[in-house]
Amino acid sequence: MSFNKLESFSNKEVIREEVSILTDLLTDVTRKILSPETFEKIAMMEDLAVHSKYQELKEIVEELTTEEMVYISRYFSILPLLINISEDVDLAYEINHQNNIDQDYLGKLSTTIDLISTRENAKEILENLNVVPVLTAHPTQVQRKTMLDLTNHIHTLLRQHRDVKAGLVNEKKWLGNLRRYIELMMQTDMIRDKKLKVTNEITNVMEYYNSSFLQAITNFMVEYKRLAEERGIKLDNPKPITMGMWIGGDRDGNPFVTAETLKLSATLQSEVILNYYIDKVYTLYRTFSLSTNLSETSQAVAEMAALSTDKSVYRENEPYRRAFHYIQSKLIQTLLYLKEGNFSNEGQRLTDRAEKTLSAKTTPSLSNKGREIIPNYIQSRISETLTELKKEETPSYKTAKEFKEDLQVIYDSLIEHHGEALVTGDLTELLQAVDVFGFFLASIDMRQDSSVHEACVAELLASANIVKDYSSLSEEEKCQVLLKQLLEDPRILSATHEPKSELLQKELEIFKTARQLKDALGEEVIKQNIISHSTSVSDLLELAIMLKEVGLIDENGTRVQIVPLFETIEDLDNSCETMEKYLSLPIAQKWIASKNNYQEIMLGYSDSNKDGGYLSSCWTLYKAQQQLTAIGDKFGVKITFFHGRGGTVGRGGGPTYEAITSQPLRSINDRIRLTEQGEVIGNKYGNKDAAYYNLEMLVSAAINRMVTHKKSDAHTSNKYERIMDQVVERSYQIYRDLVFGDERFYDYFFESSPIKAISSFNIGSRPAARKTITEIGGLRAIPWVFSWSQSRVMFPGWYGVGSSFKEFIDQDPENNLAFLQLMYKRWPFFKSLLSNVDMVLSKSNMNIAFEYAQLCEDQNVRDIFNIILDEWQLTKNVILEIEGHDELLAENTYLRDSLDYRMPYFNVLNYIQLELIKRQRNGQLTPDQEKLIHITINGIATGLRNSG
């Protein structure tokens, strides 16, 4: 049975009505800001764009003064943003509406659980499933937080308008509020003057927990258990969704991530979740006014109530209230101990700092960063409670388990005394939240490049006179040295090594901080350490040496899992050999056994794409998962995959449900992790309705892929794979011949794209390249993909696809085309692959791309565009042939209509950006005026709804 996507239920008429209102308001605001002459030019440009008269549009743009471009660029940047807001509101509305009328849609949780409810292992599947979205600081969110806040205000107003009956809306007041926020948008800086710091990235992401994640995940957990129980499946402690975090721990290529940012990330996360609990417990305190005159309580609740510092005579007969007051006091005390804690004392628990806190002369306060993300009313409540806490030494919680046990005491008492209806809602939700978030909120990954680990280990070995030049050893010799250190030498090599290099000192401090955080906040706070550019077993063992230095690993087990990240085509091809050797090591087997026999492997989508093109990347990743899963089976190890996907197709992006359900058979057991990056976080999780829906998609897709085994998968997979091997080999050659084989390509890319402006764009704390860029290989994947998106070529998402399939079809035109069409209908992987190419082609614009090619001064370099254009046309023709369609996006009319609506406006921005780049290169722009290029980058990314 097939279901429609939720987007297919969208109300296009309502969206157009809303956009018309928003556009009229924007037009009115703009008219009052600009001169009549400039405003008239905007009206002309808009009309020309809507009617695709781009040559005339180009001529007007060339005549604009730079001053006129300031507000014109803003106008055409805000227009697609307003369309996006209306579409997002419509999606959020439909999520609620379709659930209320019990309408099935693709990925609906109830339908998914129905699918497996009669299976013998249904309880095992639902109990053990764990899907982990990992939020990263990859710099693809071009919007300032201030602009995002204004966007949210407009979203809220539109949503309120839909939720209230038309006759009850004060239309004049509502329009006035909309106008105010649009006017603020038009006169607020859209881009950052200063580069983001890691601390900014941490606090920005924390906002999403307060606005969406905490409530959405809690609601999802309650619904997950309820749906299972309705079908006779009693779940004990499921965790279908938990959260991961890279910000503060991902130091690969980012020198600004330090031990301090790691500690800040962990402590701010704890502040956020503790304050969430404090707020929820306060709500329960206000709600549970049950009187002993009218109801009974358990002895345990009575004892807890007696410990409360709330001695008001008005509550002496309200034991539940006093019990919740006691719990709240303990939570506040826990928060204060966290803030006062000095993590330099290893092993110190939160409660061990009670005496220091209570004897402090001044009231402990939240950190400055904490104040940015914690609501004022909670800060006030904490301050009001401090006086009571100091009079009597209220204990704190050592662990989240203790907190849950206190809540469970109240829950059990209510059940025991006929309060089944009372426990539903806030109390049940809070119990579920504690299961998911603990006191840590999200597990922070640490990540570093393998070359850094090698340099640190080489220094340690040389300082101890073990090996003078470790880096010169062969792979076999390296492994021998490392294993001897891990198995036979108990020394902490860094203890006697002084002075240490700056690099080694920094790395050791981060690992020490990780241990201190685990000791203080629990094992869940940091669980994985990822090794970028993993190429060999020694890369994994070098990290083990670093972990050994701080006591996070020994010969019997590890407190942090070692996770290799295979990124390039070559590394992915060699990953099976690397992991087979690693899994055969007895010490590695003990480490894995200490992690319940799971071994995580991270897969890099971005670098493999830049290395070999879209088709080669996708297929290499697919085969690697198949082969690595088989190697895990050989050693009795459950291989789990961490998918390092970006927002764009060129970086592994695309529709989430299809991406997961098209993974190889058995590659998803009961765990899967995937990155959520940059602008994707806001698009998917910007409000609690959207967050719930996208979490539902993740979990439903994982369950479906775990249990769905189509006969066609096994029956025809060998033939499918042989065809893919042949096509991909040719695609790889075609891609590499141009990108790395044609000496003109480097100049073409840097001259025909806004890469220099993107590299100076303040959209993240991380540099645009790991080193000085002298070749394509040295450029990070994000600016690479971002630049091609801006120039509207979308090169990483399709180049090499057309020629490779055309050559295969031409070998036997009648049979080969028919078989590819069959593959498209029957093989989820192949359908997802081509659908993504279809989507990318629909966002490209070769007429605009031609204009960017004209930025190249040398005609010989400029001719590269003709190669790209020919391949684009061939790819489009082949894709449509295989799909059996006459136009792109024939199976995704929602996106097609959305792009048709938005595209004329951000097309205008491309022509403005082109003119600005020309003027910049001619020295006609001041440094301040050059920022206009960034505004156009922002607007185009907004229109495309993705960037890097």
From Swiss-Prot:
Entry GO MF terms: magnesium ion binding; phosphoenolpyruvate carboxylase activity
Region forming the signal peptide: none
Keyword annotations from UniProtKB, A to Z: Carbon dioxide fixation, Lyase, Magnesium
GO cellular component terms listed in the entry, alphabetical order: cytosol
UniProt xrefs under Pfam families: PEPcase
Cofactor: Mg(2+)
One example of a Gene Ontology biological process annotation: oxaloacetate metabolic process
The reaction(s) this protein catalyses: oxaloacetate + phosphate = phosphoenolpyruvate + hydrogencarbonate
Record's protein name: Phosphoenolpyruvate carboxylase
Upper taxonomic lineage: Bacteria, Bacillati, Bacillota, Bacilli, Lactobacillales
